Regions:
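Short Gly/Ser/Thr- and charged-rich N-terminal loops/segments
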Residues: 2-8, 137
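C-terminal binding/interaction regions
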Residues: 19-38, 46-47, 51-52, 57-142
Length: 142
């Protein structure tokens, strides 16, 4: 296996890292066709288990995520690649990733760099607004 050694700055452990070509080649095939070239990417904090956010990836952002080790989305609003936290410093370093059974959704377990505020509204998670669900009679209220 080709590769190189990378010394991580945060804990000075040596880890084996494959080169970019091998990493992209070995990555699972994701079904980008179902949603017009995009797949949802769920981001979960590896330390706390908290769901932090959901974004969308296209083939280019998926490759970029694999190449850099940081979650990179496709911004549907700005129509461009978007490495989450590149400006704020709260980058999402991928510790592991998996796909669902249909291979059309990704789950990233991440270590959040910076102050840990992932949401653009200044919160740790984008999931902060409760949805009233249920009533005294046990029926869903939507």
């Amino acid at each position: 296996m080709r590769g190189f050694w990378l010394r991580q700055n945060d804990n000075q452990k040596l880890m084996k890292v494959r080169d970019t070509m091998d990493a992209v080649k070995d990555a699972p095939t994701i079904d980008f066709a179902k949603m017009d070239g995009l797949v949802p990417g769920i981001v979960q904090d590896a330390k706390t288990g908290e769901m932090l956010m959901l974004g969308f990836l296209n083939e280019t952002s998926y490759r970029k995520t694999i190449e850099t080790g940081f979650v990179t989305f496709w911004s549907r609003t700005r129509q461009k690649l978007w490495m989450k936290g590149e400006t704020s410093g709260n980058r999402l370093r991928v510790l592991s990733a998996s796909t669902d059974c249909d291979q059309d959704t990704l789950l990233f377990l991440v270590d959040v760099e910076g102050d840990g505020l992932v949401c653009h509204e200044g919160t740790v998670s984008c999931f902060t607004r409760p949805v009233p669900f249920g009533s005294a009679q046990g029926k869903a209220v939507l």
